[in-house]
Amino acid sequence: MALSFFSGGGSASHAKYFDIRLDEDYIVFRGGEQEAASAHLSGKLVLCVSEPISIKHIRLHLTGISRVCWHLPSSSAGGGRKNWRERVFYEKTWKFRDAGKSKTEILPAGNYEYPFDVILEGSMPESVEGLSDTYVTYRFKAEIGRKYAKDIVVRRPLRIIRTLESSALELSHAMSVENIWPNKIEYSISTPTKAVIFGTSIRVDFKLIPLLKGLGIGQIISQLIETHDLTLNPEDPDAIRNTYKTTRTIINDEHTIDEENSLEIIDEAAEGFQFSRTLDLPKTLTRCLQDTDTRGIKVRHKLKFRVQLLNPDGHISELRATLPVSIFISPNLAIDDNNNLVDSSPQTTQRALDDLAQQAPPLYGEHQFDQLYSEVDPSGYRTPGPGSGPGTPFGTLSRNLSAENLASMNAITHTDISASALHHRLVNLDLRGHGRVSASEHDHLGVPSDNGPPSGSNTHGSNTHAPGSPELSRRASDEDVHDNIPSGMATPFIPHSAELETLSRVPSYSTAVRSSVRPHDSDLPDYQAVVAETVHMSAPQSPQQAHIRGSGTGRGSDSYFSAPMDFFHRPAFLHSRSHSHSDDERRIRLTQARGRA
């Protein structure tokens, strides 16, 4: 405020311009008094002097004042009495020029600017204006002191706004009241958020489902109620509180639904009424304050609803409900010195709502219960999973099946466990035309086989077979097949953990009591280490073994052979066999060998 607000007569003609300019129109605190950060207030005092003047000082004062006052109704005891209390809770003074006690100085003509700044604590009370005799205000007062003339004074108000943080739960939590009036009505009344920006509107969603045939819906009344709790001595908890409480109605909305045209199916379950009402808030603080609790002034708001129910027998029932709401001032909607919105157009209001909805980062209240990524099991999100096969599990994984030949089961530990694939591999393996291994080599390792006595012992009689009978064998690994394949292409088709693989191989009882399964994770020694050392391994475990049933040194005997796995990978052993017999004959002999196992 410039020259028109000077106190003084002709002396003002020497000061053509005198004003307080703020870098920001108002100070914004985000959060409550216990959590809000400090704010920086800055500006400058501008003075334009056309002629030299004599001055004592140039000062600027910032003062915070709180006042609580109420009038008791004349009809009550002590009617007409006025209770009030005013206090100065903040003071700050800047001295730009000071000639000293009882002294003056000449200020030459010219333009002057005096900058000022101060840090305001986040716990300072917010501005509360709009009531006639109750308020919390901040005011600047700039003065040019003169000795033989009236002082030149200019004043300017300062508004401090306390708004909600972007993470406040009031901005993200919907408020609703839902219940069932037995044999009467099921209802739900809700608002999108608890917090509402001053000067905007409140949307209320109704859902009414009659439970009584013939029940009608009458008038629906929605009210916004403002409550004031005033206390004279809030800073003195030990003193007897002198308080006064009053309420006023801010909005009163009455609505009647058209039952014939408004009836609809709700949630695909029942017939009812579903609609929304918009309650426009006043655009001035004199008719509606923001929610606050500071310096003995407490303001709260709530929505009250009354729904008339027209019973079939003619009497009228009334449904009542209440929802709390919180009204706060947005920095995006400017308020002038008369406590009115500067721009109350719908476009400005919508812009404030959009700015609130598009705050970044996202609202914490919407994600505080989210599961941490490290705790999420990816098996349900990544398809197929690491243990998933291309189709239905093969029969060999079923516990209803059993296998007598444990060595043949070991062959499928790291490869495709298809029974048909295993059968095809065994059929193509020609075991004829190779010299038999003597029993002395069996005794060298001294490890018992699947279905017979220890090496070196002979059993005559029922288990005799011709010298040309096929032998059961397995390939300990697919190294000979994948020698020329780059690393990674020979990865097992269906990877399983050691526990699952061990559990999935179920031998018959007779096989299980005679032998043990080689551990899945046992280390395989190389060929040179096995042939270079004489290893005597204790029965029944053999980390590296393959069992072959074949003809012994004499007719009518069973010989059992155990040897290192790399033995079977020798080219002379695998490729020096003849192929004179047909595939059908090999299949028959293979089946006979399986039966004897």
UniProtKB/Swiss-Prot annotation:
Disordered: annotated segments: 375-398, 439-492, 576-597
Compositional bias ranges of the Polar residues kind: 452-466
Protein's UniProt keywords contain Chloroplast: no
One Pfam family from the record: Arrestin_N
Organism: Emericella nidulans (strain FGSC A4 / ATCC 38163 / CBS 112.46 / NRRL 194 / M139) (Aspergillus nidulans)
InterPro entries (alphabetical): Arrestin-like_C, Arrestin-like_N, Arrestin_C-like, Arrestin_domain-protein, Ig_E-set
Name recorded for this polypeptide: HECT-type ubiquitin ligase-interacting protein creD
UniProt keyword Metal-binding, yes or no: no
Taxonomic classification: Eukaryota, Fungi, Dikarya, Ascomycota, Pezizomycotina
Biased composition (Basic and acidic residues): 472-483
